[in-house]
């Protein structure tokens, strides 16, 4: 009996003095890689028994890991907050917070054709020239991809040139576009995208396009401004009316929408806003909430990464009590 008590006492001492390492899994947009690397370091410094593991992908692909593949994540961070209410709520999420903003630019290198001529007013004319190759991510996987399509279609309205989308996209891909009687446009992204590879460079998400651009595989890339800054790329800034970074232009943006035909999902062009949530099927929701709380407490991380923070963040839905004091309910 004494021996048994000693064994039990010894075992209890080991359990009391040890902490089990927990894994905090995050699915996030590729354009959030830089700020979330910093958030990971901050969180692990404050929580020594937690290993933060991040998976970067296009935001739509991130959501589908949860909704279609039933994978577990403690935090979902999207480059387009709207994929949360439109693809996850109410079954997979019941709240989200809007945390930062961005805009689209056209990145290039010193080897890009006509880089000494291109600007925010003539870029589409440069793209039409022989031998120029431009890249964008897949609309079916990545908000940056469908935002690129929106920008090119909006350009027809802004520059008063009805040939821009036709010559840059319709002539080189299997996308379609419908012009409605009210002057709005609906782009149709097919389930299986094909492109003219002599003119268009396509990859799943925008960060997959950076290496090939820097290796001079093509000339120009539609990319988030923050990502271009983080990677030291040269870029052309687009007018506010088409760069999707200006709240004041929201009404103009709304003239263009895109349908992802393989997903039965439609998105209207809106200002670029990033969103976070903790999925309902997360194995440890408190763990995810604690990470979101860190993000909300440190908006300067977004600012340092070139992504203007929304401070305080805007909360929508059944925001957890632990976060309510850090957000403005929208």
UniProtKB/Swiss-Prot annotation:
Alphabetical UniProt keywords: Signal
Signal peptide coordinates: 1-13
Species this chain originates from: Methanococcus vannielii (strain ATCC 35089 / DSM 1224 / JCM 13029 / OCM 148 / SB)
NCBIfam families documented for this protein: PRK04168.1, tungstate_WtpA
Entry-linked InterPro entries: ABC_trnspt_W-bd_WtpA, ModA/WtpA
Top-level taxon of the source organism: Archaea
The keyword Signal belongs to this UniProt entry's keyword annotation: yes
Gene3D superfamilies on file: Periplasmic binding protein-like II
Protein name: Uncharacterized solute-binding protein Mevan_0954
UniProt similarity note: Belongs to the bacterial solute-binding protein 1 family. WtpA subfamily.
CDD domains in the record: PBP2_ModA_WtpA (cd13540)
GO biological process terms held by the UniProt record: molybdate ion transport
GO molecular function: molybdate ion binding; tungstate binding
Short name of one Pfam family: SBP_bac_11
């Amino acid at each position: 009996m004494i021996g048994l008590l000693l064994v039990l006492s010894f075992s209890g001492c080991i359990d009391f003095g040890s902490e089990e390492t927990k894994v905090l899994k995050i699915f996030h947009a590729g354009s959030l890689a830089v700020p979330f690397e910093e958030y990971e370091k901050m969180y692990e410094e404050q929580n020594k028994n937690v290993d933060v593991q991040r998976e970067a992908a296009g935001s739509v692909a991130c959501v589908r890991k949860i909704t279609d593949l039933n994978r577990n994540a403690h935090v979902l961070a999207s480059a387009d907050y709207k994929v949360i209410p439109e693809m996850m709520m109410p079954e997979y999420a019941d709240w989200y917070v809007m945390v930062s903003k961005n805009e689209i630019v056209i990145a290039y290198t010193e080897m890009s054709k006509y880089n000494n001529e291109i600007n925010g007013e003539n870029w589409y004319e440069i793209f039409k020239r022989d031998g120029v190759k431009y890249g964008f991510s897949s609309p079916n996987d990545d908000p940056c991809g469908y935002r690129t399509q929106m920008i090119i279609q909006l350009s027809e309205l802004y520059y008063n040139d009805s040939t821009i989308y036709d010559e840059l996209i319709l002539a080189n891909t299997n996308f379609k576009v419908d012009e409605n009687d009210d002057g709005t446009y609906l782009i149709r992204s097919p389930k299986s995208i094909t492109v003219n590879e002599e003119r268009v460079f396509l990859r799943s998400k925008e960060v997959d396009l950076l290496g090939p651009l820097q290796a001079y595989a093509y000339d120009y890339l539609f990319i988030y401004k923050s990502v271009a800054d983080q990677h030291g790329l040269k870029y052309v800034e687009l007018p506010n009316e088409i760069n999707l970074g200006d709240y004041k232009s929201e009404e103009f943006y709304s003239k263009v929408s895109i349908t992802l035909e393989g997903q039965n999902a439609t998105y209207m062009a809106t200002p670029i806003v990033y969103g976070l949530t903790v999925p309902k099927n997360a194995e440890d929701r408190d763990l995810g909430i604690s990470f979101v709380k860190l993000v909300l407490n440190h908006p300067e991380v977004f600012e340092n990464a070139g992504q203007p923070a929304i401070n305080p963040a805007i909360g929508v839905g059944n925001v957890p009590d632990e976060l309510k004091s850090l957000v403005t309910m929208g």
